[in-house]
Amino acid sequence: MLIGLGAVVLAGCGSSKSSSSSPGATPAATTGAAASGSASAGPSDTSSPSAASTSKAVDKTAVTGAGKSDGKLTVGDLLPQTGSLATLGPPEFAGVGLAIKEINAAGGVLGKPVTEIPGDSGDATTDIATQTVNRELAAGADVIVGAASSAVSLTVIDKITNSGVIEFSPANTSTKFTTYPDKGLYFRTAPSDLLQGGVVGNVVVGDGHSKVAILALQDPYGTGLADQAEKAITGSGGQVVSKIIYDPTAASYDDVVGQTKAKNPDSILLIGFDESKKVIQSLVSAGIGPSKVPLYGVDGNISNTLGDGLPPGTLNGVKGTTPLTKLSSDFQAKLKSVDPKLRDFNYAGESYDAVTITALATEIAKTDLPTAVAKQISGVTKVGTPCMSFATCDKLVKAGTDIAYVGVAGALKLDDAGDPTSASYGVLTIGPDNKIVDSKTTYVTAGAQ
């Protein structure tokens, strides 16, 4: 997940909750960006952009008639308007909406306007995502942008790809997708936790800590990121004195916090979503809150909403990492033209890039047949003349020139698995007002240069 500073939120992960559309809502398809910008934010997703409870039965049945060509590119949204990751929804919807707006202003794709089908993903505790996917596949979506939560994506990826349609996530970070049997139809603009785990682990040890306690929610995102962070910490000379995987729906976290305190850590890494606030309150009550023991977070919980309702100063000094590219003031202004209420920009760039890359791949394929478009997606990001906008890149494509799209999230250089091989991360610091201090944000690049 990438972010645009001023309003940093967590990414590929969770945040606070809200509910602007009901699970059964079926808004009509719209052309352009209008439909996407007003999703309200809500609690983090207990299913993380990379996690999800996958214990319930998953419907893998293909939707009859999906995956066909009708001569126009149709984009379905599968982004969080409700659920534990709803805070990530607004910037992601805005990114999709802005991309479609600019693509259509440049003449559209295959000579026709791109159509958007709005849709809520909910979180992994509901069936909202399956309902949305069924509706969008039946409506002719060529690509479904989402989900933000890895756990949610794991519940619908088979249905989408079995239907011959592309799934393109702007925020999934679970390592599971790298080797998932997706028929070559799954892609993401957010980097795998293989990269973020190394970044956050190195930040903790780089700050001089050697006895680290890890608290992580139970789900693909939490456990995967915890494992990668542990490898980085121990590989850098530090020691993980405790690694506890907790239930994100627990009524109390006093027990796991007590176990953590008993190990006398000199720092704590908290990997979670909106439940992170309750964990922090337990840490404070136990005498090992951020003012006593340095606390670190990740894209699932580090945001400007994490401190809502907490006493001033509670989060002062808390640091965290998130996929993040420094968004220009111009791009932020464009996003706000789509959604004037935006507070954070996490994954807005990744969402914008997912749509733009798909549109360019469609132009190169000369058809909106998803299986044909998918074959062009990775190449769009790495093989040719660098270009940075749909309009500029499309002119090169129509002139017969190979392109290498460099997006808002950077030069992603997608590999054969559909994963970014290079990513920019922001190291964020929260100040005494419990908000992210933009001036203290630093950037780290991980992966291929």
How would you label these PLM feature ranges?
Residues 1-449:
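Extracytosolic ligand-binding ectodomains
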